[in-house]
């Protein structure tokens, strides 16, 4: 913990082709071991596949997919009198985006297609069509929050 106050948030730079910060965040989430150029190659490849299969602008499809994955509420564990309660809380806007990208990349990695670009493209297209594992994760998160609505008064 720094003593000089809060650490300022680092701003990500938009990528050169799509001029989008959210695309850069996708690349950064996909990156392993600092291999950013490889992650960019995979993302651009995935966007090319999305464009060829949907005949639409890939960034539009990606933003639609993000809208369908982004969670609004989640549950957080809260200990009250020796019992743990799952308390539903609203998700902050920056965390919403981060969670959506994390889920998208995570479930893309688990898919069965041959290359990572194909997996990512498949997950993006599925999410844009309200199907796929990432959308299911969002629905499950919302269901969990709905089921624990009774503990909402424990919010902090």
UniProtKB/Swiss-Prot annotation:
Part of the 30S ribosomal subunit. Contacts proteins S9 and S11. The keyword GTP-binding does not apply. GO terms for molecular function: rRNA binding; structural constituent of ribosome; tRNA binding. This is Small ribosomal subunit protein uS7. Keywords: Ribonucleoprotein, Ribosomal protein, RNA-binding, rRNA-binding, tRNA-binding. InterPro entries: Ribosomal_uS7, Ribosomal_uS7_bac/org-type, Ribosomal_uS7_CS, Ribosomal_uS7_dom, Ribosomal_uS7_dom_sf. One of the primary rRNA binding proteins, it binds directly to 16S rRNA where it nucleates assembly of the head domain of the 30S subunit. Is located at the subunit interface close to the decoding center, probably blocks exit of the E-site tRNA. PROSITE patterns: RIBOSOMAL_S7. GO terms for biological process: translation. Belongs to the universal ribosomal protein uS7 family. It comes from the Bacteria. The lineage of its organism: Bacteria, Bacillati, Bacillota, Clostridia, Eubacteriales. Gene3D superfamilies: Ribosomal protein S7 domain. One of its GO terms (cellular component) is small ribosomal subunit. Pfam families: Ribosomal_S7.
